[in-house]
Amino acid sequence: MVLPLSLLKTAQNHPMLVELKNGETYNGHLKACDSWMNIHLVDVIFTSKDGDKFFKMSEAYVRGSTIKYLRIPETVVDLVKTEVNEVRRQQQREQSRGRGGGRGGRGGHRGGGGNRGGRGGAR
Protein backbone atom coordinates (compact mmCIF):
# COMPACT_ATOMS: atom_id res chain seq x y z
CA MET A 1 0.00 0.00 0.00
CA VAL A 2 1.33 3.42 -0.95
CA LEU A 3 0.39 6.34 1.27
CA PRO A 4 -0.54 9.60 -0.49
CA LEU A 5 2.02 11.69 1.39
CA SER A 6 4.88 9.34 0.53
CA LEU A 7 3.73 9.54 -3.08
CA LEU A 8 3.80 13.34 -2.96
CA LYS A 9 7.23 13.44 -1.31
CA THR A 10 8.60 11.24 -4.10
CA ALA A 11 6.86 13.36 -6.75
CA GLN A 12 8.85 16.48 -5.82
CA ASN A 13 10.44 18.13 -8.89
CA HIS A 14 8.17 16.09 -11.19
CA PRO A 15 5.28 17.44 -13.28
CA MET A 16 1.72 17.00 -12.03
CA LEU A 17 -1.82 18.11 -12.67
CA VAL A 18 -3.94 19.29 -9.74
CA GLU A 19 -7.71 19.56 -10.15
CA LEU A 20 -9.63 21.45 -7.50
CA LYS A 21 -13.13 20.73 -6.22
CA ASN A 22 -14.39 23.83 -8.06
CA GLY A 23 -13.10 22.52 -11.43
CA GLU A 24 -10.00 24.70 -11.84
CA THR A 25 -6.74 22.97 -12.76
CA TYR A 26 -3.06 23.69 -12.12
CA ASN A 27 -0.37 22.07 -14.25
CA GLY A 28 3.18 22.44 -12.96
CA HIS A 29 6.18 20.91 -11.21
CA LEU A 30 5.83 20.02 -7.53
CA LYS A 31 8.30 22.01 -5.45
CA ALA A 32 7.07 21.11 -1.95
CA CYS A 33 4.17 19.67 0.04
CA ASP A 34 3.30 19.32 3.71
CA SER A 35 1.37 16.88 5.89
CA TRP A 36 -1.94 18.65 5.12
CA MET A 37 -1.30 18.06 1.41
CA ASN A 38 -0.83 21.77 0.73
CA ILE A 39 1.11 21.94 -2.53
CA HIS A 40 3.65 24.43 -3.87
CA LEU A 41 3.96 24.28 -7.68
CA VAL A 42 6.39 26.09 -10.01
CA ASP A 43 6.15 26.81 -13.77
CA VAL A 44 2.36 26.62 -13.52
CA ILE A 45 -0.36 26.82 -16.15
CA PHE A 46 -3.71 27.58 -14.56
CA THR A 47 -6.91 26.67 -16.42
CA SER A 48 -10.32 28.04 -15.41
CA LYS A 49 -13.15 25.61 -14.66
CA ASP A 50 -14.90 26.25 -18.00
CA GLY A 51 -11.58 25.74 -19.82
CA ASP A 52 -11.59 29.01 -21.76
CA LYS A 53 -9.03 30.97 -19.70
CA PHE A 54 -5.35 30.05 -19.29
CA PHE A 55 -2.77 31.81 -17.16
CA LYS A 56 0.94 31.12 -16.90
CA MET A 57 2.38 31.67 -13.41
CA SER A 58 5.88 31.28 -12.03
CA GLU A 59 4.50 29.56 -8.91
CA ALA A 60 1.26 28.71 -7.12
CA TYR A 61 0.27 27.50 -3.66
CA VAL A 62 -2.74 25.17 -3.45
CA ARG A 63 -4.49 24.43 -0.17
CA GLY A 64 -4.81 20.67 0.37
CA SER A 65 -8.48 20.73 1.43
CA THR A 66 -9.49 22.21 -1.97
CA ILE A 67 -7.89 19.41 -4.04
CA LYS A 68 -10.17 16.97 -5.84
CA TYR A 69 -7.44 14.82 -7.40
CA LEU A 70 -3.82 14.77 -8.53
CA ARG A 71 -2.45 13.28 -11.72
CA ILE A 72 1.14 12.11 -11.25
CA PRO A 73 3.38 10.45 -13.88
CA GLU A 74 3.48 6.64 -13.81
CA THR A 75 7.27 6.74 -13.34
CA VAL A 76 6.80 8.43 -9.95
CA VAL A 77 4.31 5.75 -8.88
CA ASP A 78 6.85 3.07 -9.84
CA LEU A 79 9.56 4.87 -7.84
CA VAL A 80 7.34 4.88 -4.75
CA LYS A 81 6.57 1.18 -5.11
CA THR A 82 10.26 0.29 -5.26
CA GLU A 83 10.99 2.51 -2.23
CA VAL A 84 8.17 0.87 -0.22
CA ASN A 85 9.45 -2.61 -1.13
CA GLU A 86 13.00 -1.66 -0.09
CA VAL A 87 11.79 -0.35 3.28
CA ARG A 88 9.84 -3.58 3.87
CA ARG A 89 12.89 -5.70 3.05
CA GLN A 90 15.02 -3.65 5.43
CA GLN A 91 12.44 -4.01 8.22
CA GLN A 92 12.28 -7.78 7.70
CA ARG A 93 16.09 -7.99 7.91
CA GLU A 94 16.06 -6.07 11.18
CA GLN A 95 13.34 -8.30 12.65
CA SER A 96 15.07 -11.52 11.62
CA ARG A 97 18.30 -10.35 13.28
CA GLY A 98 16.58 -10.16 16.62
CA ARG A 99 17.31 -7.29 18.93
CA GLY A 100 17.95 -7.85 22.62
CA GLY A 101 15.77 -10.93 23.03
CA GLY A 102 16.80 -14.31 24.39
CA ARG A 103 19.90 -14.92 26.51
CA GLY A 104 22.17 -12.05 27.28
CA GLY A 105 19.66 -9.35 26.49
CA ARG A 106 18.93 -6.32 28.60
CA GLY A 107 18.07 -6.74 32.24
CA GLY A 108 20.99 -8.78 33.47
CA HIS A 109 20.94 -11.76 35.83
CA ARG A 110 17.85 -12.22 38.05
CA GLY A 111 19.45 -14.29 40.81
CA GLY A 112 20.62 -13.24 44.25
CA GLY A 113 21.92 -9.74 44.10
CA GLY A 114 24.72 -10.14 46.58
CA ASN A 115 24.31 -7.63 49.40
CA ARG A 116 22.10 -5.31 47.42
CA GLY A 117 18.54 -4.64 48.40
CA GLY A 118 18.08 -7.51 50.84
CA ARG A 119 16.20 -7.43 54.15
CA GLY A 120 17.89 -6.90 57.36
CA GLY A 121 20.40 -4.14 57.25
CA ALA A 122 24.14 -3.94 57.48
CA ARG A 123 25.98 -6.74 59.30
From Swiss-Prot:
The residue range of the signal peptide is none
Specify the domain of life of the species encoding this protein: Eukaryota
Q: Which UniProt keywords apply?
A: mRNA processing, mRNA splicing, Nucleus, Ribonucleoprotein, RNA-binding, Spliceosome
Compositionally biased, Basic and acidic residues: which spans?
Answer: 85-97
Q: Where does the record place it?
A: Nucleus
**Segments forming domain Sm:** 3-76
Sorted alphabetically, the Gene Ontology cellular component annotations on this record are: cytoplasm; nucleus; P-body; spliceosomal tri-snRNP complex; U2-type precatalytic spliceosome; U4/U6 x U5 tri-snRNP complex; U6 snRNP
* Predominant localisation class: nucleus
Gly residues compositional bias, start-end = 98-123
Instruction: Write out the GO biological process terms.
Output: mRNA splicing, via spliceosome; nuclear-transcribed mRNA catabolic process; P-body assembly; spliceosomal snRNP assembly
Q: Which Pfam families match?
A: LSM
Q: Which region ranges are annotated with the description Disordered?
A: 85-123
Q: Which CDD domains match?
A: LSm4 (cd01723)
Quaternary structure (record): Component of the precatalytic spliceosome (spliceosome B complex). Component of the U4/U6-U5 tri-snRNP complex, a building block of the precatalytic spliceosome (spliceosome B complex). LSM2, LSM3, LSM4, LSM5, LSM6, LSM7 and LSM8 form a heptameric, ring-shaped subcomplex (the LSM2-8 complex) that is part of the U4/U6-U5 tri-snRNP complex and the precatalytic spliceosome.
Family assignment from sequence similarity: Belongs to the snRNP Sm proteins family.
Protein name in UniProt: Probable U6 snRNA-associated Sm-like protein LSm4
What is the source species? Caenorhabditis elegans
